[in-house]
Design a protein with these regions (language model features):
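Gly/Ala-rich beta-loop-alpha elbow adjacent to hydrolase catalytic centers
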Residues: 110, 114, 119, 123
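Active-site-proximal beta-strand elements of phosphoester/diester hydrolases
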Residues: 204-207
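Short, basic/aromatic recognition patches
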Residues: 166
Length: 231
């Protein structure tokens, strides 16, 4: 049986030993999650947006990973966040990937920044600087609770309520019209997961980091299994 080919967006950072040499990379949990779920993982490096069509044609599904803030110019705002952490070329390339994946009817799964970017690409906006959602605990520590819509695939995996890790200081503000919220933080109503409500788009996005919880609990591996084999 042919394994699904899952394209994982890559980030860029300096090599710690040689800061004049950059690395294209994705955290290994994304690759491990795809592999353990039965898929083949391919990294998609930040590239010219004209190459998005070819990249998407090579894969069966797309995963948008975390990283920098989404440049607020894409939702018609000026930056007023406490950090100036942007990567414009990455935003542009990944928006081209989203557009092509939608055209080619390839499912999309997103995590953290990826979910924020998806919302912006579809016409939504972001809270630029929120509090109490960047934990100072180990990455697999379950930091706060989450309430899940009972009429969602997430509820089949996690139940109506669970706890999640949290590493973000931006979140969805105005929701894109093609999306619906399927999970929130019960304390402050922060959006923690969304899915497509459009028949033309197969999409699931989460705000937490299941790739860091693969050895912590089975639900997060089941999420990757759903993405790789069913989404």
């Amino acid at each position: 049986m042919t394994k699904p080919i899952i394209g994982i967006t890559a980030n860029v950072r300096p090599n710690p030993a040689h800061e004049d040499i950059n690395w294209s990379y994705a955290p290994s949990g994304f690759v491990e999650g795809v592999q353990r779920a039965g898929g083949l993982a391919i990294l998609l490096p930040v590239s010219d947006p004209s190459e998005a069509k070819t990249y998407i044609s090579m894969i069966d599904k797309l995963i948008l990973i975390g990283g920098q803030n989404v440049d607020p110019k894409f939702y018609n705002e000026k930056n007023h966040a406490s950090e100036d952490d942007f990567f414009l070329e990455r935003d542009i390339f990944e928006m081209a990937l989203i557009e092509e994946a939608t055209k080619q009817k390839k499912p999309i799964f997103s995590i953290c920044r990826g979910t924020q970017l998806m919302n912006v690409a579809l016409g939504g906006s972001l809270h630029q600087d929120i509090e109490n959602h960047w934990q100072d605990k180990p990455s697999d520590y379950l930091y706060h609770e989450m309430i899940v819509d009972e009429n969602s695939k997430l509820a089949e995996i996690y139940g109506r309520g669970t706890s999640i890790n949290s590493f973000h200081h931006q979140s969805i503000k105005h929701l894109a019209s093609d999306l619906r919220v399927i999970a929130r933080d019960p304390e402050d109503n922060t959006v923690e997961a969304v899915e497509s409500n459009s028949p033309d788009l197969r999409f699931l996005g989460v705000q937490w980091h299941p790739e860091l919880l693969l050895d912590k609990r089975e639900e997060d591996l089941k999420l990757f299994e759903y993405v790789v084999n069913e989404l």
